[in-house]
A protein has these predicted regions:
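Active-site entrance/lid segments in N-terminal catalytic domains of soluble metabolic enzymes
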Residues: 1-79, 91-94
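Glycine-enriched alpha-helix->loop->beta-strand junction motifs that scaffold or abut catalytic
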Residues: 58-62, 78-92, 112-115, 137-141
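Short loop-to-alpha-helix "cap/lid" segments that border enzyme active sites
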Residues: 47-53, 57, 99-113
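Glycine-rich, proline-tolerant flexible connector loops at the mouths of alpha/beta enzymes
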Residues: 36, 89-99, 148-152
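Short beta->alpha connector loops at strand-helix junctions that form conserved
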Residues: 66-67, 88-89, 122, 144-145
Length: 195
């Protein structure tokens, strides 16, 4: 924070944040404590892979499963009818000892990448990270914190600037690797053991 005083100053002068997709829709949610209780009530420990197929049938649309961290779960997701999966350790905030998502990406792509789309979430902080994931077979990446920092400090302009930074970093890295088309980037641009 000391290295980014202007960002801190902007954060101090933004309006209070709320959970806009929950406030007004969930009963008795008025503060973080009640939100935590409500969130805990939304999880059913009895859910199984059989339920995924049933949910897909009821839903009738595309089904994406987030939170996959093993090739075994990836195979179960594919067998259950998922259209895509997202490798995610939820930023490590749920389980501090979880593997990094990029470490498990190659094994999961090898197991199911020809059957369903594989995306990656968690740990993306630069355009170079995005390029590494694409080189290892991910269809794309998801990014949360970087956009939230930009949004918090500068609103929509901050999000736009974040996108520009990530794009420019990825574009520059591709150029250094001798590529102009992200669809043609493969593992050959990576030094084994550096991801």
């Amino acid at each position: 924070l000391a290295l980014r005083p202007q960002w801190c100053w902007h954060m101090l002068h933004t309006k209070r944040r709320t959970f806009g997709n929950i406030v007004g829709h969930a009963k008795n949610v008025s503060d973080l404590s009640s939100l935590s209780s409500w969130t805990s009530e939304q999880f059913d420990p009895r859910l199984s892979w059989d339920d995924v197929a049933r949910i897909k049938d009821l839903w009738g649309g595309k089904l994406i499963i987030k939170g996959i961290m093993t090739s075994e779960d990836a195979e179960k997701a594919a067998q259950s009818g998922a259209d895509a999966l997202i490798i995610s350790n939820h930023g490590g905030r749920q389980l501090d000892g979880a593997l990094s998502t990029i470490k498990v990406l190659p094994e999961i792509v090898s197991a199911v990448g020809s059957q369903i789309e594989v995306w990656l979430d968690s740990g993306i902080v630069s355009g170079q990270d995005i390029l590494k994931c694409m080189a290892l077979g991910a269809k794309g990446t998801m990014i949360g914190k970087a956009f939230l920092y930009g949004l918090g400090a500068y609103g929509e302009d901050g999000v736009r600037r974040c996108l520009e930074i990530l794009y420019n970093e990825m574009d520059t890295t591709m150029a250094f690797c001798g590529h102009t088309d992200i669809k043609k980037v493969g593992k050959e641009i990576l030094v084994p053991g550096t991801f």
